[in-house]
């Protein structure tokens, strides 16, 4: 463990002290690498309901993408037992940026969580529901003809958005799993039988929410002059109410030349598919109702997907020097964190929405890892809205998990 460190920016002489400060502690340690994953699902909370256990992966190497079928160890960090690392399972569907799409089941967040896995023999992807009390997989969501896996759990539970990770591994490796079976038609840039699916976690039933063919048609209607590039999905995000989904339709990431990078929204019943001309940069995050947090120009903005207008701003460009960073809103909606890179470090700005007070953290070493093996800032809140899990390199050069804790000075 490292010592606790104050992490506030300097306060000018004569100025009032910040109403809160930040403390940093190292959660995991050792010769192995430990990490959680990224913020590709909204309200992604690494802690279970009681706050005792934190989910993580343990791996041997961080300087390369995993080999096809290479396993990562799934671990629990017991915060009541000196952060003991407890191995419980393995997954063969993971990568260094996103992990394995961990998400505690909102309907049983004390003991159950989702993760992605692949069949060792067939390479087909699927999602697992695991119970830490029973120490067993209590359900696997398999679709053998057209395998897909979790790409975003509904924040209130009951469903997850499912994606074809084989297609993503082909079209943008950093978001896929190497060697996963790809069932989509390589010669069809926008197949009608692939896209975003919704899986009912209770029944296991699956339906196609929106197809790539529908997205391609919408792009043409909106007069996006792009070549017929194969489309894929990134950042499939349920809103807090569970009635809207925001996502990016993309293409051309594995080649030189023009790209497609267009935001869409759709109601969770499959209606109101909307192609947005206002691009929200970075990793978007849902605020209240129909509001999405992202970047427009130098500003951290609130964009209303229903009115298709910018509805407000958070802070200023001085507070958020890179509004296109990784962003996350606390579970109660009162706190916001923006993680951004400078050189070989990740920094975090913690912002209180009620009064605009903010504090910037010290830098977390991310090394020179880049591209598919980069260490993104990826901040993730706890359930009590006073701590954030972040990645970084420890003194021995291993990738570890750190906690930024908010301390009141009032």
Feature annotation, model-predicted:
Residues 25-37, 87-96, 144-145, 206-228, ...:
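Surface-exposed loop and turn segments in beta-propeller and other repeat-based domains
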Residues 57-71, 115-119, 162-193, 248-260, ...:
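Short, conserved, GDST-rich strand-edge loop motifs in beta-rich repeat architectures
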Residues 39-43, 61, 67-119, 125, ...:
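Blade-loop segments of beta-propeller domains
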Residues 91-106, 115-195, 209-225:
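Asp-box/WD-like beta-propeller blade repeats and closely related beta-sheet repeat scaffolds
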């Amino acid at each position: 463990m490292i010592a606790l460190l104050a992490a506030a920016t300097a306060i000018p002489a004569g100025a009032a002290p910040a109403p809160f400060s930040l403390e940093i502690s190292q959660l995991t340690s050792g010769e192995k690498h430990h990490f959680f994953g990224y913020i590709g699902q909204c309200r992604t909370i690494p802690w279970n309901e009681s706050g005792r256990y934190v989910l993580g992966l343990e791996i041997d190497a961080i300087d390369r993408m995993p080999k096809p079928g290479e396993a990562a160890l799934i671990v629990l960090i017991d915060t009541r037992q000196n952060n003991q690392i407890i191995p419980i399972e393995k997954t063969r569907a993971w990568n260094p940026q996103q992990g394995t799409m961990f998400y505690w089941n909102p309907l049983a967040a004390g003991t159950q969580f989702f993760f992605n896995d692949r069949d060792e023999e067939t390479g087909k992807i699927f999602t697992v529901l695991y119970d830490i009390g029973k120490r067993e997989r209590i359900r696997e969501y398999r679709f053998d003809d057209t395998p897909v896996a979790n790409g975003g759990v509904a924040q209130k539970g009951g469903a997850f958005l499912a994606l074809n990770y084989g297609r993503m591994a082909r079209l943008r490796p950093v978001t896929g799993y190497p060697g996963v079976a790809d069932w989509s038609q390589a010669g069809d840039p926008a197949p009608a039988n692939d896209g975003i699916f919704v899986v009912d976690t209770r029944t296991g039933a699956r339906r196609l929410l929106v197809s790539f063919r529908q997205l391609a048609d919408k792009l043409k209607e909106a007069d996006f002059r792009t070549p017929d590039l194969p489309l894929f999905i990134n950042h499939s995000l349920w809103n807090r109410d569970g009635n809207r989904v925001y996502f990016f339709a993309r293409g051309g990431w594995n080649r030189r030349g023009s790209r497609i990078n267009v935001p869409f929204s759709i109601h969770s019943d499959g209606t109101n598919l909307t192609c947005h001309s206002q691009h929200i940069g970075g990793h978007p995050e849902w605020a209240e109702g129909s509001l999405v947090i992202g970047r427009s120009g130098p500003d951290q903005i609130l964009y209303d997907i229903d009115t298709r207008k910018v509805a407000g701003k958070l802070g200023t460009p001085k507070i958020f020097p890179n509004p296109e960073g990784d962003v996350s809103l606390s579970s109660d909606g009162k706190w916001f964190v923006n993680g951004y890179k400078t050189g070989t470090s990740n920094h975090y700005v913690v912002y209180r929405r009620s009064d605009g007070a903010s504090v910037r953290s010290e830098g977390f070493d991310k090394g020179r890892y880049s591209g598919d093996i980069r260490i993104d800032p990826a901040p993730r809140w706890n359930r009590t809205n006073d701590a954030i899990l972040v990645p970084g390199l420890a003194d021995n050069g291993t990738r570890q998990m750190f906690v930024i804790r908010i301390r009141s000075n009032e």
